[in-house]
Amino acid sequence: EFEKFEDDSVFDDAVKRGSYILAYSKTVVKKVCEKAQPRKIDGKSILVVNASHWMSEIGSRLSPDCDFAVMWYWDHEAKETKVSLRAFHEAVDVSEIAKRFGGGGHKKAAGFQLPRGKHIEDIFDKPKVSQKKASTRKKKGTT
Protein backbone atom coordinates (compact mmCIF):
# COMPACT_ATOMS: atom_id res chain seq x y z
CA GLU A 1 0.00 0.00 0.00
CA PHE A 2 2.91 2.36 0.66
CA GLU A 3 4.15 1.85 -2.89
CA LYS A 4 1.47 4.17 -4.25
CA PHE A 5 3.09 7.05 -2.37
CA GLU A 6 6.29 6.40 -4.27
CA ASP A 7 4.40 7.21 -7.46
CA ASP A 8 4.92 10.94 -8.09
CA SER A 9 1.63 11.20 -10.00
CA VAL A 10 -0.32 10.30 -6.83
CA PHE A 11 1.50 13.03 -4.92
CA ASP A 12 1.06 15.54 -7.75
CA ASP A 13 -2.67 14.77 -7.91
CA ALA A 14 -3.00 15.32 -4.15
CA VAL A 15 -1.20 18.67 -4.41
CA LYS A 16 -3.45 19.70 -7.29
CA ARG A 17 -6.62 18.78 -5.37
CA GLY A 18 -5.31 20.55 -2.30
CA SER A 19 -4.71 23.74 -4.25
CA TYR A 20 -8.36 23.68 -5.42
CA ILE A 21 -9.58 23.21 -1.85
CA LEU A 22 -7.35 26.04 -0.62
CA ALA A 23 -8.56 28.40 -3.36
CA TYR A 24 -12.18 27.53 -2.56
CA SER A 25 -11.74 28.10 1.18
CA LYS A 26 -10.01 31.45 0.59
CA THR A 27 -12.90 32.55 -1.63
CA VAL A 28 -15.50 31.55 0.95
CA VAL A 29 -13.59 33.24 3.80
CA LYS A 30 -13.27 36.44 1.75
CA LYS A 31 -17.00 36.50 0.97
CA VAL A 32 -17.96 35.87 4.59
CA CYS A 33 -15.60 38.62 5.80
CA GLU A 34 -17.20 41.09 3.39
CA LYS A 35 -20.46 40.63 5.35
CA ALA A 36 -18.92 41.53 8.72
CA GLN A 37 -20.68 44.31 10.62
CA PRO A 38 -19.15 46.75 13.10
CA ARG A 39 -20.32 46.63 16.72
CA LYS A 40 -18.87 47.33 20.16
CA ILE A 41 -18.38 45.25 23.28
CA ASP A 42 -17.18 47.12 26.37
CA GLY A 43 -16.39 50.06 24.12
CA LYS A 44 -14.03 47.96 22.01
CA SER A 45 -14.56 47.99 18.25
CA ILE A 46 -15.36 44.59 16.80
CA LEU A 47 -16.34 43.07 13.50
CA VAL A 48 -19.07 40.45 13.77
CA VAL A 49 -20.24 37.92 11.21
CA ASN A 50 -22.45 34.85 11.10
CA ALA A 51 -20.21 31.90 10.24
CA SER A 52 -20.23 28.25 11.23
CA HIS A 53 -17.03 27.18 9.46
CA TRP A 54 -13.46 28.42 9.09
CA MET A 55 -13.67 30.44 12.32
CA SER A 56 -9.90 30.71 12.72
CA GLU A 57 -9.39 31.82 9.14
CA ILE A 58 -12.21 34.38 9.31
CA GLY A 59 -11.04 35.67 12.69
CA SER A 60 -7.47 35.95 11.44
CA ARG A 61 -8.61 38.00 8.49
CA LEU A 62 -10.95 40.32 10.44
CA SER A 63 -9.12 40.85 13.74
CA PRO A 64 -6.26 43.09 12.50
CA ASP A 65 -8.89 45.68 11.46
CA CYS A 66 -10.60 45.93 14.86
CA ASP A 67 -10.03 45.21 18.55
CA PHE A 68 -11.32 41.66 18.04
CA ALA A 69 -13.55 39.61 15.74
CA VAL A 70 -16.77 37.79 16.65
CA MET A 71 -18.05 34.84 14.65
CA TRP A 72 -21.33 33.22 15.66
CA TYR A 73 -23.83 30.64 14.46
CA TRP A 74 -26.94 28.79 15.60
CA ASP A 75 -26.17 25.14 16.41
CA HIS A 76 -29.35 23.28 15.42
CA GLU A 77 -28.43 20.10 17.27
CA ALA A 78 -27.48 21.79 20.55
CA LYS A 79 -30.23 24.42 20.14
CA GLU A 80 -27.90 27.26 21.14
CA THR A 81 -25.90 30.10 19.66
CA LYS A 82 -22.17 29.45 19.63
CA VAL A 83 -19.81 32.41 19.65
CA SER A 84 -16.12 32.46 18.77
CA LEU A 85 -13.78 35.38 19.50
CA ARG A 86 -10.42 36.07 17.85
CA ALA A 87 -7.91 38.81 18.64
CA PHE A 88 -4.85 39.99 16.78
CA HIS A 89 -3.69 42.92 18.92
CA GLU A 90 -1.68 42.33 22.12
CA ALA A 91 -3.83 44.71 24.19
CA VAL A 92 -6.92 42.50 23.88
CA ASP A 93 -7.61 39.33 25.89
CA VAL A 94 -10.73 37.70 24.44
CA SER A 95 -10.71 35.00 27.13
CA GLU A 96 -11.80 37.71 29.60
CA ILE A 97 -14.75 38.61 27.35
CA ALA A 98 -15.68 34.93 26.97
CA LYS A 99 -15.55 34.37 30.75
CA ARG A 100 -18.18 37.09 31.23
CA PHE A 101 -20.54 34.99 29.14
CA GLY A 102 -19.69 31.67 30.79
CA GLY A 103 -17.04 30.58 28.30
CA GLY A 104 -13.29 30.49 28.19
CA GLY A 105 -10.25 30.06 26.04
CA HIS A 106 -6.97 31.78 25.42
CA LYS A 107 -5.88 35.41 25.10
CA LYS A 108 -6.20 35.38 21.31
CA ALA A 109 -8.95 32.76 20.80
CA ALA A 110 -11.95 32.07 23.01
CA GLY A 111 -15.62 31.20 22.85
CA PHE A 112 -18.90 30.69 24.64
CA GLN A 113 -22.50 29.63 24.14
CA LEU A 114 -25.40 32.01 24.62
CA PRO A 115 -28.11 30.82 27.01
CA ARG A 116 -31.50 30.00 25.51
CA GLY A 117 -33.56 33.10 24.94
CA LYS A 118 -30.52 35.32 24.36
CA HIS A 119 -29.79 36.74 20.93
CA ILE A 120 -26.37 37.63 19.55
CA GLU A 121 -27.31 41.34 19.61
CA ASP A 122 -27.69 41.08 23.41
CA ILE A 123 -23.91 40.87 23.87
CA PHE A 124 -23.14 44.14 22.11
CA ASP A 125 -23.04 47.63 23.62
CA LYS A 126 -26.32 49.46 23.12
CA PRO A 127 -26.11 52.72 21.17
CA LYS A 128 -26.35 55.72 23.45
CA VAL A 129 -29.05 58.27 22.67
CA SER A 130 -27.93 61.78 23.47
CA GLN A 131 -30.18 63.95 25.67
CA LYS A 132 -30.54 66.44 22.82
CA LYS A 133 -31.84 63.77 20.45
CA ALA A 134 -34.12 62.34 23.12
CA SER A 135 -35.65 65.76 23.92
CA THR A 136 -36.07 66.52 20.20
CA ARG A 137 -37.97 63.26 19.73
CA LYS A 138 -40.15 64.03 22.72
CA LYS A 139 -41.00 67.52 21.41
CA LYS A 140 -41.81 66.18 17.95
CA GLY A 141 -44.06 63.52 19.43
CA THR A 142 -46.06 66.00 21.55
CA THR A 143 -46.93 68.48 18.80
Regions found by a protein language model. Give the residues of each.
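Gly/His-enriched, cation/cofactor- and phosphate-binding structural elements
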Residues: 26-143
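Hydrophobic, aromatic-enriched interface-forming segments
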Residues: 1-36
